[in-house]
């Protein structure tokens, strides 16, 4: 009996610290995933999470010692566990609230990350840290040997941390998801509190509240989602999400564009990795993939099939492009995360019968495996093309940009093959870009760099680096195969000299590859970009509520935070001033949008802005100036349509400008083009009917209206269909007259 009593005397305290330490470590690992939607995943986020939680545990140990000396240990433990379970819920709520605070985005990026993590995770860390000292005091009060008891408490606490680490990293995140894990930890802590104080009725009350909140937060029913979003237990529902999952590496989401159901986006954490049109996968959406395509076309020398390797799968857009254009090719995709591949198959169009060969492992390990097989006398592929697509602008894998890795890639690259890398940097700072170029030149004798021509030297841009063993005329190849559609900037010797100077001729090696530090300017620029997006989202919300003056202020704050958004923001400000009747201010805002576009490196289309400006000038009675703006918009749209004749929105915009100038025939022809390309767009039907009616072409208008009504019926928009039916009758009456 004495042995059993002694066993329970030490078992209960050690089991308690095991569970509390297990929960702390689960919280630490989950913390980095929970904040990834707002802050991404980088060295900064991991540093902040580890530092803040260790600080919380330290403070908790200090406070817990005082609690142990002052209050009854068993009841204290029950209360601490109960409060800890409450803070788990608060963690979810705070993360959603803090992530939306605009003022945080004005801080430097490291301080922003630290502040966000501290506000969300410091309190639960402190509370869980208080438990171990109180448990130790409880064990000692039972008369157990001091040294052995303290040693057992420390050992089982460490064992709990180890178990929590492996369980979370290897199983729980992939199987349960971040939010479910947090609620599970909260439930465990609540159960522990009840076990320690069974007769405490407030704990039973809190258990009922906890279960109710967990139901609201976890049940997929619409009422639960709406209620949870109101109290920040969930993010607001996003109707654009088609697929969502959480893997060991990323939060994965596939979204559909609001303005085009055929346009899909593939997200990994905050990074929009891929974009595609489901009805035309050959129409590549990113400039870097189009550069990849034309270089591949130019260097393949009419080969029937290729041997290619892609480092990083994402949405598998470019590998599928190769599969389609060069059928029978060997395409090896090295994607570390099998859940990314699963998402691409289930929601992003990657077929299960694809000929693409996916290897789920780190690219460095795969290349090492190939080289071992080669040294062992086995035949391994010699790739014609290797594409690097595993780099984001926050935390690129350092092991894939070192000199040692480049040497290994060179060994599996054919003599006339090329290695292409897509990476993000700011040209003016150029630390990461310059270092990668410097490093590649140590392995490959010929290295070239190209990017989109419409970029700013002072903000983030995607660069494509092409490295090979033989000389190529990159500009000639691209110009021959891309048909003049791409406006590109080829970095020359002076540009490369600038990058070499900025990067201090740094060579990245396995021993020294500080990629996160090299990307600090990019991270800061990214923070300003995200901050401006918060202002823009707020401005749009205010605009929808009719609070136009406040919306204008929010747009102007976005411009001040991140001038790159000036074109978009000034255009919206002009629209708001127009709606408020302040036409002179509207003209000024539209002119500022055009001026910024002309002066900055970010050349964007101004046809829409010029159309808006022309409309306001007409209202002011300045018809000649208005016509000039409409004509400039028409010229720009025609240039774009020469290269991209299948852009229905451009044909629609062209029609709007012709209509504004009174050229109804040209407007109708343009609207018909838009409608032919996108027959399910109700706006195109509406505008075509209106311009045909204005032109007195009632018979044609009636035919279009009948199709419009059928479209509404097919979409189950019966009320709108009935309204259009009355409109149709009025058109038929006009035809009879």
Give the ranges of each region predicted by the language model:
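Conserved alpha-helical positions within TPR/SEL1-like repeat arrays
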Residues: 536-540, 567-579, 604-618, 648-659, ...
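Short coil turns that delineate tetratricopeptide repeat
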Residues: 563-564, 598, 604, 638, ...
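Alpha-helical transmembrane segments of multi-pass membrane proteins
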Residues: 1-244, 256-261, 270-273, 297-306, ...
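Soluble small-group transferase modules, centered on the S-adenosyl donor enzyme superfamily
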Residues: 202-300, 448-544
């Amino acid at each position: 009996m004495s042995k059993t009593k002694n066993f329970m005397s030490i078992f209960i305290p050690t089991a308690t610290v095991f569970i509390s330490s297990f929960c702390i470590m689960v919280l630490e690992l989950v913390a980095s995933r929970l904040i990834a939607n707002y802050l991404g995943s980088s060295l900064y986020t991991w540093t902040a999470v580890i530092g803040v939680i260790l600080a919380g545990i330290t403070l908790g140990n200090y406070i817990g010692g005082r609690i142990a000396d002052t209050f009854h240990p068993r009841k204290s433990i029950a209360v601490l566990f109960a409060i800890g379970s409450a803070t788990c819920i608060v963690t979810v709520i705070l993360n959603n609230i803090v992530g939306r605070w605009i003022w945080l985005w004005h801080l430097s990026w490291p301080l922003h990350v630290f502040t966000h993590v501290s506000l969300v995770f410091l309190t639960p860390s402190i509370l869980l840290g208080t438990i171990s000292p109180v448990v130790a005091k409880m064990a000692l009060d039972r008369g157990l040997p001091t040294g052995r008891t303290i040693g057992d408490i420390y050992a089982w606490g460490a064992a709990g941390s180890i178990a929590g680490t492996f369980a979370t990293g290897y199983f729980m995140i992939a199987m349960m998801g971040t939010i479910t894990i947090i609620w599970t930890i909260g439930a465990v802590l609540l159960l522990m509190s009840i076990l320690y104080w069974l007769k405490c009725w407030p704990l039973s009350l809190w258990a009922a509240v906890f279960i109710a909140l967990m139901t609201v937060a976890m049940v997929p029913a619409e009422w639960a989602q709406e209620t949870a979003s109101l109290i920040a237990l969930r993010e607001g529902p996003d109707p654009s999400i088609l697929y969502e999952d959480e893997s060991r590496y990323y939060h994965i989401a596939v979204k559909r564009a609001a303005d085009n159901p055929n346009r899909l986006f593939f997200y990994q954490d905050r990074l929009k990795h891929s974009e595609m049109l489901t009805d035309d996968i050959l129409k590549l959406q990113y400039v870097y993939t189009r550069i990849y395509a034309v270089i591949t076309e130019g260097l393949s020398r009419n080969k029937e099939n290729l041997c290619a390797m892609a480092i990083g799968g994402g949405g598998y857009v470019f590998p599928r492009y190769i599969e389609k254009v060069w059928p029978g090719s060997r395409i090896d995709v090295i994607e570390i995360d099998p859940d990314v591949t699963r998402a691409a198959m289930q929601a992003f169009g990657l077929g299960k019968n694809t000929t693409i060969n996916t290897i789920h492992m780190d690219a460095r390990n795969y290349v090492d495996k190939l080289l071992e097989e080669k040294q062992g006398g086995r035949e391994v592929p010699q790739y014609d093309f290797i594409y690097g697509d595993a780099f984001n602008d926050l935390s690129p894998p350092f092991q894939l940009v070192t000199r040692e890795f480049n040497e290994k890639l060179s060994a599996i690259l054919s003599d006339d093959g090329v290695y292409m890398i897509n990476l993000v940097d700011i040209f003016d700072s150029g630390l990461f870009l310059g270092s990668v170029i410097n490093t590649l030149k140590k392995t490959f004798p010929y290295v070239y760099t190209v990017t989109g021509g419409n970029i700013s030297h002072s903000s983030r841009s995607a660069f494509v680096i092409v490295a090979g063993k033989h000389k190529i005329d990159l500009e000639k190849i691209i110009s021959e195969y891309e048909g003049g559609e791409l406006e590109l900037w080829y970095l020359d010797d002076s540009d490369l000299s600038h990058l070499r100077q900025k990067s201090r001729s740094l060579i990245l090696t396995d021993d020294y590859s500080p990629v996160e530090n090299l990307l600090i300017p990019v991270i800061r620029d990214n923070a300003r970009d995200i901050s401006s997006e918060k202002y823009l989202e707020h401005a749009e919300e205010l605009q929808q509520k009719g609070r136009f003056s406040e919306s204008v202020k929010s747009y102007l704050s976005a411009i001040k935070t991140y001038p790159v958004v000036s074109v978009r923001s000034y255009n919206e400000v002009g629209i708001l001033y127009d709606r408020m009747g302040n036409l002179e201010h509207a003209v000024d805002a539209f002119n500022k949008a055009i001026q910024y576009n002309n002066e900055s490196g970010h050349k964007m289309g101004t046809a829409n802005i010029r159309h808006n400006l022309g409309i306001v000038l007409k209202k002011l009675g300045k018809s000649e100036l208005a016509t000039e703006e409409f004509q400039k918009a028409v010229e720009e749209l025609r240039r774009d349509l020469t290269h991209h004749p299948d852009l229905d929105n451009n044909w629609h915009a062209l029609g709007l400008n012709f209509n504004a100038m009174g050229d109804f025939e040209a407007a109708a022809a343009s609207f018909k083009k838009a409608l032919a390309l996108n027959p399910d767009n109700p706006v195109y039907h509406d505008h075509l009917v209106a311009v045909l009616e204005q032109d007195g072409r009632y018979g044609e208008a009636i035919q279009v209206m009948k199709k419009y009504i059928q479209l509404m019926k097919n979409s189950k928009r019966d009320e709108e269909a009935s309204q259009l039916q009355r409109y149709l009758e009025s058109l038929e009456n006009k035809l009879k007259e």
